[in-house]
Amino acid sequence: MDENKIIDQLFSKEYTPQDDSEQAKNGDVSLYGLLDEVANGRRLMNCLFHSPMQMGNKLSTDKLDGKCRQIQRDWIDEEKTITMNSGALQLDGPVLFSWSHNVAPTSHQETINTTFKQGSPSRGSNKPKITTTSQLFDRASAEIDKCIKPNSKSWMVEERFERNEAHTADGKKPSTWANSDFKVDPLQKFVVKELPKEKKKSDGDKTKKNKSKRKSFFGFWGHSGSKSGSKKKSEKPIEAKNEIQDEVSQKSGLSPDDDTTFSDKNTIQSKQESMSDQQAEPKVHEPAVTNTGCSEHDDGDGFEQVPAQSSYHPSSEPSIASTPSLTLDSFIPLQPKKKI
C-alpha cells in the first residue's frame, strides 16, 4: 500500500472499504499453507528467520551468522592448540614424511647450495646460524672465565675455540650427517638388528701363544718333567723285551706268535711246579752224624743205601726251550721318587 492512499482515506469524508489482501483468493496458496504441509514447518521457519531486532521488512539472519561464527572460532582454537603443542602430541594433525637434505651425498648437496646462492639475492653478510644453547653456553663460560685466572687453560675455553673455528669455516667442513650410513625409510617397519659379535680366537693362535711362552728357570722341578721321564723309561724296557723275543724266536725257528704262546705256557707250568714242590716237600730233620767205626771201604756201601723218601720224581717233563722266555710281567718300569 502507498502512503498517499492511506492519507487520502483518513482525510476523505466518504470511506470506501477495499478488499483485504490477506484474504486468500480462489487458487492462491499462502506461505503458511506450504509450511503446514511439512511437520514442524512453522517452528523451523521461526527459528531461522525470527529475531527481536527486526527492522522493517528485512528478514533476520542472526542465527545463521552466529552458527557460522561459532564454527570459525572452534577452528581457530584447534589450530592454536596444534601449534602450541609439541610434535609428540600432534595426533590429530596430518603427518608429512620427507628425506633430509643432509642425508644426500656431498656432491648433490654442493650443487644445491650453489644454485641457491646464485638464485637468491644477497641479504647482507652470510653469517652462520648459532643455536640458543651455544649462545647460553658462551655467556656462561664468559662469566666463568672472569673468575678463573687468565693463564689457566680450561676445557671450556678449548671447546669454545674449536666451536668458533667450525663457524669460521662457513660450511666448508661437511656435517656429521652428510656421509652417515644410517638410513631408514619411514614408510617401512623398523627392524632391530644385533651388533656383530667379536670373533673367538682360533686354536692356531692359542698354540702360537703357548709356543712363545718361555720356560721358567725351575722347570725341571715341575710335575710335567717327571711324567715325561717316566714315559721315556717305560718305553725302553718294552723295546728290549721285543728284541729278546725276536732273538728267541729266530733261534727256535718259531714265529713270534707261536713263541709268545709257548712262553706263556712255560710260565704257567713253572708256577705250577713251584707251588706243588712247596706243598709236597715235608720238613725233614737230618740225623746226627755218628762214627760207627766202619772202615773206609764201607763208605761205598753207605751211598748205595738211599731211603725211599729221598727219591726224586719230577712232577712234569722238562721244557723244550733252551733259554727261558721273558714275559712282559717280569719287567716293571722305574718310577721317580716322590718329593718329601
UniProtKB/Swiss-Prot annotation:
Other remarks in the entry: Present with 815 molecules/cell in log phase SD medium.
Protein name: Uncharacterized protein YML037C
Low complexity bias locations: 217-228
Tree of life domain: Eukaryota
Region feature Disordered, mapped onto this chain: 193-340
Composition bias type Polar residues, residue spans: 263-279, 307-328
Gene Ontology CC terms: clathrin-coated vesicle
Cystine crosslinks: none
Ranges annotated as biased composition (Basic and acidic residues): 193-207, 235-244
